[in-house]
Amino acid sequence: MEAFAVAIQSVINDSGFLAFTTYNAIMILVGLILLYLAFAREFEPLLLGPIAFGCVLANIPRNGFEEGVMALISAGISQEIFPPLIFLGVGAMTDFGPLIANPKTLLLGAAAQIGVFVALGGAMMLGFTAQEAAAIGIIGGADGPTSIYLATKLAPHLLGAIAVAAYSYMSLVPLIQPPVMKLFTTQKEREIVMEQLREVTRFEKIVFPIVATIFISLLLPSITSLLGMLMLGNLFRESGVTDRLSDTSQNALINTVTIFLATGTGLTMSAEHFLSLETIKIILLGLFAFICGTAGGVLFGKLMSLVDGGKTNPLIGSAGVSAVPMAARVSQVVGAKANPANFLLMHAMGPNVAGVIGTAVAAGTMLAMLSNH
């Protein structure tokens, strides 16, 4: 009987209830709210769902996650394994044809990155270090894997807040972008019908990822792992002889890695790291960055329309953020409401895929500037 009592006492002493705090309860509530948004409201459920559940797990006291499979999942993020693998799948799902057919849309993808650098300056004004500000600013590119990659390198203690902000704003693209697009364009500009894009050859689609990888990687070696995997996935897609690799990359692989990446991100959302004034600042700065990025793309689209005599609909500029393909769909929806004869989707895909490259380049630029500081 005494042995039984000792065993019961041991279970009680090891119980998480004894170490459970109000802060743990608050973070578990945050996780449950995110689960509701993911599954009931369908806000980026494939990503926000695992992140939310990881948040719940991270706030169970004495969870023993320092070893075992959870430690391996965390290592996949800290050792920068998962983001490049996500990019492999993204590359296999991406068609660079609209960008190749209309190369000037690359400039729209670049213009949309203004939000990244505006937010960087704003974050530094609010007291964040240069490294922290850079990691926060990249939220404006609306690219979750790149945000995680840069945060891991420059501000790992802010990873949870940055990832949640990035994926939240990606899911809210249809709500955030239209008011900004309408604010900076006239009805006449939104009604512009663009000419059909030319057909892109298979040779062009194969050469593009090779040339882009070599040139950009030589310019910014720090993003070679991200960009290289993106373009390798695209080569699988376009080569015509690696269908099995392409299918695996854009289905089984990316789905599996998404589970680990999102869950691992949630595991960083422990109360001691997440419950702070900095988290609120990060969420607000991320929203500001995303709005500025959308505005930057639209304003550059207006300039492009002015230069080419009204052949470019400025609405496609908002797709310069790298939320693929949601941002391009928003351009299509807003354009079609202004003019039912408008079909902007393929035109918007040009700046949209350019935004993926642009956000990676912005991340590489900041890494080159700050990694040694």
Task: Label each residue range with its predicted role.
Residues 99-120, 271-297, 348-352:
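Entry/N-cap segments of selected transmembrane alpha helices
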